[in-house]
Amino acid sequence: SGAESDFGDGAAALMIGNENVAVEIEGVYSYTEEFTDRWRRANDQFVKTWEERFVNTQGYNRLLTITVTNALKSVNLKPQDVTKLIYPAHSKTAHTRCTMPAACGFTKAQIQDALFDRIGNTGVAHPLQMLVAALEEAKPGDRILLVSYSDGGVVFNLRVTDKITGLQGNRRGIKKHVATMKDLPNYGRYLLFRGLVSREYEAPAPVPYASLPREWRERNSIMSLHGSKCRKCGEVQFPVERVCPKCLSKDEFDEVSLAQTPAKIYTYNKDFATPTSDPPNSMCQVDFEGGGRIQCIMADRDPNELEIGMPVEMVFRRFHEETNIIHYYWKA
């Protein structure tokens, strides 16, 4: 379907503060109108939509034009004052044919790439991911108009400060995430990952076990990938432990984050027996630069390319589901 080629999976998070900011919010405008075009209930597997012409003419194009026109008036801005215009869309075609930019006086050069060829429509995260992509190329003083759409829209009038140069290239952002993406080998693997098909026979998987009290006690290691660094000898270990395995000092440590630390494969195996949607199941032990080792499952990898000493990065992924609770952990 068209949705399969246009939709994508992704998330975005921004840190909000009032000191030393890279981007200033100089104004916000919102417009709401009761309009149903696309929907999905909690238990629905697929997104549903009304007839496309009605959705685009009476909904998407009309509501975006009203929202952005009013936003420009509210903050006393002209289209030529804006460096980049960011607006999401439910499909690549809808974004390309959107009538709002021309109606409001924007040029094609001002429109931010919607990432459909690289990531796709990730839903709520889509405009924020487009913003991150714009900030990777932004210069101090640039003005960005960030627009979200749903039964109307919200417009953020943003100004880039000189602090942006300290962030560019130091975060994964869009560029680095896209650079490490792996293509699925075939359409069947996609359907399997989505749970849309099942195998003719699959051995029963082990029943996952999770302890919520333990997950809470070790939340810094599980959620934030924190290890401990001994204050006396400098030994780093994972997960956080009270006793140093090298000098045996007790409670003499500082927590250190390993999530962004360069790492390499120490050893690995290929498990063809354990049930998995992406065989073989690849387990590895990873050594972090400066100390620390973790055993974990590998993701986004080609089993034929694995080798000892291969550089890897850590990613936070869905691990398993138990009693209707989704648990997350780190993979390499």
Regions found by a protein language model. Give the residues of each.
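OB-fold/S1-family single-stranded nucleic acid-binding modules
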Residues: 307, 315-332
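Short nucleic-acid-contacting surface segments enriched for D/E, G, S/T with interspersed K/R
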Residues: 300-314
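Conserved catalytic cysteine-centered active-site region
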Residues: 1, 97-130
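Conserved hydrophobic positions within beta-strands
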Residues: 263-265, 298
